[in-house]
């Protein structure tokens, strides 16, 4: 099945979405968005699903491994609107929310926004994943 949806990435945990897949997705997005040698600001948060803390910590490790000049703002447990607010407030380059929104508890995923908390569309997600 396809985990790439219109404005997010989600699937059943741990079969379709897991720590390894989250790291691969984040790696592709950072490669696409990062400007060499400039500070890169990322806001990251997660919802209260049981699988979210593990995915959140895997994502943070992946970010720290790839980006040297980074300002990482950890929202910890948060709502998606709060993460979007923080992304805009801190003028972040990217916001990452670990959530599967309204989907059943066995699902999890990511919502990723760019500058000004602008959501990244499904077409853009696929382009980044195919090039990243």
Question: What is each of the regions a protein language model found here?
Answer:
Residues 1-15:
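N-terminal amphipathic/basic leader segments beginning at the initiator methionine
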């Amino acid at each position: 099945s396809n985990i790439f949806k219109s404005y997010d990435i989600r699937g059943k945990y741990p079969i379709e979405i897991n720590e390894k897949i989250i790291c691969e997705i984040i790696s592709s997005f950072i490669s696409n968005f990062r400007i060499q040698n400039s500070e890169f600001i990322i806001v990251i948060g997660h919802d209260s699903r049981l699988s979210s803390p593990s995915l959140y910590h895997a994502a943070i490790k992946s970010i720290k491994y790839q980006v040297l000049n980074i300002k990482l703002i950890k929202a910890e447990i948060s709502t998606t609107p709060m993460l979007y607010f923080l992304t805009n407030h801190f003028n972040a380059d990217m916001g990452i929310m670990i959530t599967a929104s309204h989907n059943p508890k066995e699902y999890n995923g990511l919502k990723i926004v760019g500058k000004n908390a602008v959501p990244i569309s499904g077409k853009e997600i696929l382009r980044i994943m195919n090039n990243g």
